[in-house]
Amino acid sequence: MINDLITLTQQLIRQPSITPNDCNCQKIITDYLKSLQFNIEPMNSSNTSNIWAYRYGYDQKKYTTLLFAGHTDVVPPGDIHNWQYPPFSGTVHNNIIYGRGSSDMKGALAAMLVATKSFIQKYPKHKNRIAFIITSDEEGSGIHGTKKIIKSLIHRHEHINYCIIGEPSSNNKIGDVIKNGRRGSCTGKLVIHGSQGHVAYPQFLKNPIHLAIPILSKLLNTMWDQHKSTLFPDTSIQITHLHTIPINYSTNNITPEQLILNFNFRFNDQSTMHSIHNNINKILSNYHVTYHLHWESKSEPYFSAPGKLVNIIIDIIKKYYNITPQLNTTGGTSDGRFIIQTGAEIIELGALNNTIHKVNECIDLVDLKSLSHIYFKIMEKILL
């Protein structure tokens, strides 16, 4: 088992699949699934590679579907000279696999696939259906990935009962945290207009940087939620970029014409896109500035009520790893926000998240084996 896990994880890491480029990952995955008699349906959209794959049990008319969902795309590695080993080498050192995507989430994909092979070899006449959704557009816009697949599946009345997403949910040990929801996200750009002028004559200019300071203070100190959420962390804002126009580094005696501020909200079930938009506009109206506000992207929060799948996973992790998993909704967005539309119970369970998107991203071989074992045990509980 461990040799298969290492080989498959390395094969996937060695594909430099920077979002949304799949870069041959899905061929590796589909070849693996075809050898297990899966039906493979490509659902490519624009520049994104997608697959829907499934294998029926012995009853093709009345069955439960367990879906594994994941992504093959990764974020850029940054300066490769800062890496201990080349980011797309899949180097193993001291029982740790290094490489971009090792924990987010090519290791989890390999663990799912190897667990599926082990399950089918042990139970070739299983009752229920196993399915996979794989996309190369999760780290990017998400427009052409799982969102498109789910839309097609809903249109043709595909039924999904349970879903495991291989996002890196664990904090210190595999299975110590599982997620059943995520906050929503919305990104905006605020342009504050001033007037350019000589710094020695403040009476003849409007410095947009000065105009922005009290606005920034207000934005960062506002309580956005009407009530405390019992399901999610508080709604929060982060400023992501700040720059002026024109950018003039050759002199320090001129003020800019405009200040451009990019920001991102992570919002819970006590706030909405509409309420955030309204509150931002109310704040800006109090400062008598000329501005333009543009909203660039959004995703809604999702929450999956704990049910049979959660109970199964908690029991497995307690029994085999002596850990009581914490159930929470922290972290960034995930494709669970699209899959929730199917009505499936969703859990995110994957590798440790302490090196994701970082230089020297890695996954421990012991953790990889544990993750695959947990997936296998879940299949035993649901698919037989």
Swiss-Prot record:
Zn(2+) 2 binds at D104, E139, H357. Binds 2 Zn(2+) or Co(2+) ions per subunit. Pathway: Amino-acid biosynthesis; L-lysine biosynthesis via DAP pathway; LL-2,6-diaminopimelate from (S)-tetrahydrodipicolinate (succinylase route): step 3/3. One of its GO terms (biological process) is lysine biosynthetic process via diaminopimelate. The keyword Hydrolase applies. It comes from the Bacteria. Its cofactor is Zn(2+); Co(2+). PROSITE patterns: ARGE_DAPE_CPG2_1, ARGE_DAPE_CPG2_2. It is an enzyme of class 3 (hydrolase). The active site is at D73, E138. Zn(2+) 1 binds at H71, D104, E167. Catalyzes the hydrolysis of N-succinyl-L,L-diaminopimelic acid (SDAP), forming succinate and LL-2,6-diaminopimelate (DAP), an intermediate involved in the bacterial biosynthesis of lysine and meso-diaminopimelic acid, an essential component of bacterial cell walls. NCBIfam families: dapE_proteo, PRK13009.1. This is Succinyl-diaminopimelate desuccinylase. It comes from Blochmanniella floridana.
